[in-house]
Amino acid sequence: MAEAATGFLEQLKSCIVWSWTYLWTVWFFIVLFLVYVLRVPLKINDNLSTVSMFLNTLTPKFYVALTGTSSLISGLILIFEWWYFRKYGTSFIEQVSVSHLRPLLGGVDNNSSNNSNSSNGDSDSNRQSVSECKVWRNPLNLFRGAEYNRYTWVTGREPLTYYDMNLSAQDHQTFFTCDSDHLRPADAIMQKAWRERNPQARISAAHEALEINEIRSRVEVPLIASSTIWEIKLLPKCATAYILLAEEEATTIAEAEKLFKQALKAGDGCYRRSQQLQHHGSQYEAQHRRDTNVLVYIKRRLAMCARRLGRTREAVKMMRDLMKEFPLLSMFNIHENLLEALLELQAYADVQAVLAKYDDISLPKSATICYTAALLKARAVSDKFSPEAASRRGLSTAEMNAVEAIHRAVEFNPHVPKYLLEMKSLILPPEHILKRGDSEAIAYAFFHLAHWKRVEGALNLLHCTWEGTFRMIPYPLEKGHLFYPYPICTETADRELLPSFHEVSVYPKKELPFFILFTAGLCSFTAMLALLTHQFPELMGVFAKAMSDIFCSAEFRDWNCKSIFMRVEDELEIPPAPQSQHFQN
């Protein structure tokens, strides 16, 4: 019964929609019939005569004023359209036409849309959740004191935005603090330090936290039950204070490494103590989770220091050990650091093994994963690749695999090739990136450009094939090929993450809609005609009459430019030019 009632309601709705479609025609004929019947009481004939007489009495100045007014209105519409397009990326009139006028004029298949919505509701919700712009911590981020601040000292430019640094402060509060920090004076100070905006205030707070730990405290624990001998202990060092000093105060990588080694001693001790007490309650469990994050962060940054200082093999070993010890902590994306270090060692077999583990359909992708896979496949054929030879004989299987890998990488992040091919200048990468955005492209190319240059012919193959990706995805914002449609929000988020002196790469490149171009041309042409008519009324009148004769005459093909100009001279009575006189010596 319920299904029958539902079917009857759907049929009734379709009948109502069908009747409304043709009811407009009925109303139109009814209005025409009423006008015809009431033509005498309404004095329609007299009104038409009055209107025609009024139009006949209008002077050319009225038409000039009317043309100027229409040009002004068109210009205002053009300015509004341009502003709306710059702000929202679409034409206002086109959007209104598509959203409101098309359903009224062309109709919409409600049944099919309802069915598609009901059947694809889950997939649409999943797509929206996946395509939502999420900002990620840059796994290859630089050191503020040793790298970012030195860039500022040399160039006078700030490489980090306030939004980016604010995200880092939130990350530090999440990773390095817990609810029980107020019980320990040093941790309480550091909890406030991570929220400080002023770098000098943060550094001073870190030094204060370390000074507190230097104070000896008497712990009244007798070594022997019936003895009066007491044990003197030192408060445990504050590992997070060393982290802050290594990140922001150290001016060289070597100084940062020394501070991180001190942080490792303190962090390892705190981690072992909290590991023994983690099952005693939720408070101890949260403290152990915090100590785990601190220890992983310290070891990862020590590996990055070794990589910066040229000890690449040592860095690889530290990263492998860290991934084995903490396999579940994927939020730091240590495998991307490992891939970059292995590429520096040219250990391509090890790189392939890491990709086989992390380039999985169930795991989130990144530019490092996609472009490293493309680099490995391009390495097998790039040294012998020639576009002329490929056009003659076609692509081999290995070349086809390399091209498909490049297309896959470009579809995921289309901004990277311009940086790898040095078509666009690089800047220092931000501390946070947006997947598939310009910020991720900068972070990848900053560290991996040297690896692409090291593989002979890889950049040439990329240069010849990367633009072919866009033929497979003509509408990247609506439908993708191997990935979800390109998210619309990347440009806005990248502008917040990247400094103002950098020109953000936009994909797909926005082109002005035809309506804006047409309105601009029509407005300019009309304004020019109005100005010429106002300044040269006689000449424009002759020109208009000549043009009307050309288009209205049956013999317009026999006319030529000479006859037109002769007629203009006769009408305006232009005097002949004076003959030049030759001066004799």
Curated annotation (Swiss-Prot):
Phosphoserine: residues bearing it: S386
Domain of life: Eukaryota
Glycosylation sites: N47
Membrane in keyword set: yes
Residue ranges crossing the lipid bilayer per the database entry: 15-35, 62-82, 512-532
GO cellular component: membrane
Keywords on record: Glycoprotein, Membrane, Phosphoprotein, Transmembrane, Transmembrane helix
Topological category with respect to the lipid bilayer: Multi-pass membrane protein
Subcellular location: Membrane
Family named by the database record: Belongs to the ST7 family.
Name of this protein: Suppressor of tumorigenicity 7 protein
